[in-house]
Curated annotation (Swiss-Prot):
Binding site for GTP: D59, I60, R61, E62
Protein name per its UniProtKB record: Nucleotide-binding protein Sfum_2066
Alphabetical keyword list: ATP-binding, GTP-binding, Nucleotide-binding
Residues that bind ATP: G8, L9, S10, G11, S12, G13, K14, S15
Organism lineage: Bacteria, Pseudomonadati, Thermodesulfobacteriota, Syntrophobacteria, Syntrophobacterales
Keyword rRNA-binding (UniProt): no
GO molecular function, one term: GTP binding
Length: 286
């Protein structure tokens, strides 16, 4: 049984994530009281054997969550359950803007507190849980559709026999580092097609830009050597029980060089029969 706990900061996209898992045929429950979790999983195994994938949305609205989750998660692990924690977050100003747009009340807010204080309070309360997360996703630069697509790509092929799911991500340094990245490539040393007038308004998915970037010896050598490094490291990650690996390639704007490199690295890994998703985070920002 594959169990995913979706949690994180209020306003960071938990409901969107749960809907994405629902579309992937996960059995989904939002705000299940944490003390009921062991009993619920035991019931599924006993009376609902067709349920193999479960996604649970849990946050501070469930009052006993912060008090009970650590012991309950530990007990479940010792009982042999395989589960992971996805922690969603975003910058404080992003969360403020989202709450202002929806006019919803933050669950940690009171009539005497400001929204920003409620966000800081929740962030501090969830700090320990964040440190236990299997995956941390910063949704600040993602639209609702992009977050849903990211989860769909990552989990659509995951089953009980899957060893490692790999995501190769392109991004622009000018928009910030991707917090979910396990490894980051800085490819700003490569020749930049942005300064070629015929290529400036294209992106790295186009044949024209890809061919131009890959024409340089430095590019080809980098792709070959970094790909070889990953092929050596991935079996070690699998041996340690890692289930998800995010490799990020960054250039200045996230439109040209990083996109080409991400596609090539993903191709190298696919050639060796690894399941790989590619996500170009900042294409829409340029």
């Amino acid at each position: 049984m594959h169990v995913v706990v979706v949690t994180g900061l209020s306003g960071s996209g938990k409901s969107t994530a749960i809907k994405a898992f629902e579309d992937l045929d996960y059995f989904c429950i939002d705000n299940l009281p944490v003390p009921m979790l062991p009993e619920f999983l035991a019931l599924c195994e006993k009376d609902m054997p067709d349920i193999h994938k479960i996604a649970l949305g849990i946050d501070i609205r469930e009052r006993k969550f912060l008090k009970d989750y650590a012991k309950i998660f530990q007990d479940l692990e010792e009982s042999g359950y395989r589960f992971e924690i996805i922690f969603l977050e975003a910058a404080t100003d992003t969360l403020q803007r989202r709450y202002s747009q929806t006019r919803r009340v933050h669950p940690a807010a009171s009539s005497q507190s400001l929204l920003v204080d409620a966000i800081h309070q929740e962030r501090e309360q969830l700090r320990a849980l964040r440190s236990r997360a299997t995956r941390i996703i910063d949704t600040g630069t993602l639209s609702v559709h992009q977050l849903k697509a990211m989860i769909t790509r990552t989990y659509s092929m995951i089953g009980d026999t899957e060893l490692l799911s790999i995501q190769v991500l392109s991004f622009g340094f000018k928009y910030g580092l991707p917090f979910e990245a396990d490894m980051v490539m800085d490819v700003r040393f490569l020749p930049n097609p942005y300064f070629v007038e015929a290529l400036k308004n294209l992106d790295g998915r186009s044949e024209e830009v890809s061919s131009w970037v890959l024409r340089w010896t430095a590019t080809r050598e980098f792709v070959e050597e970094y790909g070889a490094l990953l092929l050596k490291l991935i079996p070690l990650y699998i041996r340690e029980g890692k289930r998800y690996l995010t490799v990020a390639a960054g250039c200045t704007g996230g439109k040209h060089r990083s996109v080409v490199i991400a596609e090539r690295i993903a191709g190298t890994l696919r050639d060796h029969n690894y399941f790989v998703n590619v996500f170009h985070r900042d294409l829409h920002l340029e």
